[in-house]
Amino acid sequence: MNSTYLSEKFSAGLPYHKYILTGTEEQQRRWRQVYDLAALTDAQKQLAGGFVREMKVLIVSGIWCGDCVQQCPLQQRIAEANPGKIDLRLVDRDQNRDLIEQLRINAGDRVPVTIFMAEDFEPCGVFGDRTINRYRALAKKQLGPSCPLGVIPPDQNELAATLSDWMDEFERIQLMLRLSSRLRSKHAD
């Protein structure tokens, strides 16, 4: 995956609120439910609001996927904390086979997979399919299929822990971008 390829995929992606409109009424309800429950703490808002490097964030998702329902709205909330520096888009896994084949996790076409890029679409990191706290919650419950449907929203503690995991990853990428000698030279800082 090079910057040209990623730029094309990003351009074809949809902003969050347009992406969820691709789902059925029930799917849209599930995504809105988690989005409405998700809230950054004041410290998280301040942290994301302090990002100075532009980040491109592309999520490979499935509107039908329970893990996407329970994690993508959290990433959108982070992006909303600094819309001038965090540009987030989503693409459908099944409509982007060429992309997902390059992002296989444990030999599977897992989603969500988040691709973090610099302002010029240079890849900086790939994260998926679940955060550590999401895995802990699933292991504790030991219920349902390997890809839950997102019918029941996560409890508030799980939601907050998973949001914190995603915030850590956004911060890690921002620090990578901020400390990049290539970008520091470009921006003279």
Model-assigned labels for residue ranges:
Residues 109-119:
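Acidic, Ser/Thr-rich peripheral helices and adjacent loops at domain boundaries
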Residues 58-62, 75, 83-99, 117-119:
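Thiol-based oxidoreductase modules, predominantly thioredoxin-like and allied folds used
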Residues 65, 96, 122, 132:
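Surface-exposed, flexible loop/turn segments at secondary-structure boundaries
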Residues 63-70:
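Conserved redox-active cysteine motifs that mediate thiol-disulfide chemistry
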Residues 1-55, 77-84, 100-110, 124-189:
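Non-globular targeting/processing and membrane-anchoring segments
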Residues 58, 70-71, 153:
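Aromatic-enriched hydrophobic runs in primary sequence
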